[in-house]
UniProtKB/Swiss-Prot annotation:
This is Nucleoside diphosphate kinase. It catalyses: a 2'-deoxyribonucleoside 5'-diphosphate + ATP = a 2'-deoxyribonucleoside 5'-triphosphate + ADP; a ribonucleoside 5'-diphosphate + ATP = a ribonucleoside 5'-triphosphate + ADP. Keywords: ATP-binding, Cytoplasm, Kinase, Magnesium, Metal-binding, Nucleotide metabolism, Nucleotide-binding, Phosphoprotein, Transferase. It holds the Pfam family NDK. It is found in: Cytoplasm. The lineage of its organism: Archaea, Methanobacteriati, Methanobacteriota, Stenosarchaea group, Methanomicrobia. The active site is at 118 (pros-phosphohistidine intermediate). It comes from Methanocella arvoryzae (strain DSM 22066 / NBRC 105507 / MRE50). The gene is ndk.
């Protein structure tokens, strides 16, 4: 049995407004990752401040909070082997100009402040961020029909 890890992913307002949600979900699913939780929401100021708490003292914090609240977002819990590192590699670098073609940011993002997507940077961050956005009852447990072909 393969040990599966969960990570938190959010399509930011720019990704939602540009109609990229379906393409992004498809990339994760085609890679063999499983979406076990998903919701569209408008992030409250309180939730935005909790989510980005580690940046509270930084000069860009107010803009970060303002942007994440500027429109609807799509929050997801994604599960799979090494999900945190797998998803991070699929996203590309935070600065889109440094992101390789074929990554989500390399293909769709132009500006660091509007970089389409957020994902947890560690298993600890994933647990914290998942708990901010999802109740345990909102996360599904199921097996993909192709799991026997994905993992040894």
């Amino acid at each position: 049995m393969v040990e599966r890890e969960r990570t938190f992913v959010m399509v930011k307002p720019d990704g939602v407004q540009r109609g990229l949600v379906g393409e992004i979900i498809s990339r994760f699913e085609r890679r063999g990752l499983k979406i076990v939780g998903m919701k569209m929401l408008e992030v409250s100021e309180e939730l935005a401040k909790q989510h980005y708490a580690e940046h509270a003292a930084k000069p860009f914090f107010p803009g970060l909070v303002s942007f994440i609240r500027s429109g609807p977002t799509v929050a997801m819990v994604i599960e799979g082997k090494d999900a945190v590192s797998m998803v991070r590699s699929m996203l590309g670098k935070t600065k889109p100009i440094e992101s390789a073609p074929g990554t989500i940011r390399g293909d769709f993002a132009l500006d660091m402040g509007r970089n389409v997507i957020h994902a947890s940077d560690s298993p600890e961050s994933a647990k914290r961020e998942i708990s901010l956005y999802f109740k345990t009852s909102e996360i599904a447990t199921y097996a993909r029909i192709d799991e026997q072909w994905l993992y040894e």
